[in-house]
């Protein structure tokens, strides 16, 4: 399962950089775990070059060849079984079970769906595999004759799966009578901090968007013993905030310079992030933390981003090979829609009752101020599996 976690985390960084190309000055927030899971479901129904391209984008082969580049023809022509399908399926099954464990001290509601035009019926074997390994039942729907009704039904299902937090995933023009297959992924997350902020300490303070512009935010504050790590190139500081039971952590990566976010984003690699956030790099400090309250709800039509990353054949009617999914030819992926919701406040990711405890340490710790009053990167990690569930940047209140 370690190789799957590595693939998901590598995808997180590559995908964030792709989104950043067309989102200058904008917030970014997505779930690499959610997108990887939904694309893996599609991958298992593809063959040939279509499968090889998806494997490339999802980083399934990267651990076998650290020198591969997106343009590598060798990778494009890789056989579907370059990494055993059984391994991918069972790894996802294990990871899904770990992350969605009902004993976890957080709520993670995921809506994963594959919707295919009913004149392109799914293979029974594919339907069985999706239910067994992913807990998902692909749906045959009537895009051809009732696209609007189908869109509303999909949106209603997503809304119910995410406890009403994610609405209208598919916009008005998302599907039409020519739509053949749509992939949807929406995630709602709710967690409680191990150490909660006191609302009495929250004040309106300026958030410096750049050296010349600032906006007021509600800035939370607390002084606690927290894990901190230092980044030398580029100059930045990182901090780990545990959620209750320490199943999950929020990591903040704050550039030293107000305008240093772009440089930090470009510098982040899987290897560097693993090094920075390793236990060896963490030091316990008495931290005076200032963190803005914020709510992010970002929607993405992933077709263009995924195509430009190398996964183009799946969206091309004349090239797509979904023979592992349906007996009908000409089936192709019309669109991929993803939406994630997060709210960072005094209690955690959504207001809820809860108490935090603190370990009492008699040794005197060095003091440090962590003032997130300018653009920063953040991600939420599932600690047992080391998987990045959510990744984002906050630069525009």
Swiss-Prot record:
Q: Annotated site (Reactive bond), which positions?
A: 362-363
Keyword annotations from UniProtKB, A to Z: Cytoplasm, Nucleus, Protease inhibitor, Serine protease inhibitor
Q: Which PROSITE patterns match?
A: SERPIN (PS00284)
Cited InterPro entries: Serpin_CS (IPR023795), Serpin_dom (IPR023796), Serpin_fam (IPR000215), Serpin_sf (IPR036186), Serpin_sf_1 (IPR042178), Serpin_sf_2 (IPR042185)
Q: Where is this motif: Nuclear localization signal?
A: 74-77
* Entry's Gene Ontology molecular function annotations: serine-type endopeptidase inhibitor activity
- Annotated localization: Nucleus; Cytoplasm
Q: What is its main location?
A: nucleus
CDD domains assigned: serpinB10_bomapin
Q: Name one GO cellular component term.
A: extracellular space
Q: Which family does it belong to?
A: Belongs to the serpin family. Ov-serpin subfamily.
Q: What does this protein do?
A: Protease inhibitor that may play a role in the regulation of protease activities during hematopoiesis and apoptosis induced by TNF. May regulate protease activities in the cytoplasm and in the nucleus.
What is this protein's name?
A: Serpin B10
Q: Which organism is it from?
A: Rhinolophus ferrumequinum
